[in-house]
Amino acid sequence: FSYADADGKFSGIDVDVCRGVAAAVFGDDTKVKYTPLTAKERFTALQSGEVDLLSRNTTWTSSRDAGMGMAFTGVTYYDGIGFLTHDKAGLKSAKELDGATVCIQAGTDTELNVADYF
């Protein structure tokens, strides 16, 4: 939920969270160094101390909460899973998509949740 514009200035809700923490901890919301990370890099960067705070899309699971040596501070964004189809399909339930080809980002909790659903 953040991006860097053409000038390299970061914006978005994740950036706002980081600025809020910097303001609370350092008294200055500009005392932030943004480090773009992929989903694969994020936990290693936090565990190694490369970053002090991870503010990005990360599903709070019991295995992550208990087994990764990190502390989730609270939910900043709550989402769900939905399916978008053409209205001509006439579907009344997501269950009618069983056996259909569904586009999902690989390696995400959403992928696992959808596989469990069907």
What are these regions (language model features)?
Residues 2, 54, 84, 101-103:
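Short, well-ordered beta-strand segments
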Residues 76-82, 107-118:
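Histidine/lysine/aspartate-rich catalytic loop segments that bind and position anionic ligands
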Residues 1-13:
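Short glycine-rich His-centered loop
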Residues 19, 23, 27, 31-96:
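Acidic, polar ligand-binding/catalytic clefts
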Residues 4-7, 19-30, 110-118:
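Ligand-binding cleft/hinge of the Venus flytrap
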Residues 6-8, 59-60, 86-90, 102-110:
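Short coil/turn segments
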Residues 10-11, 32-35, 99-103:
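Short, well-ordered beta-strand elements
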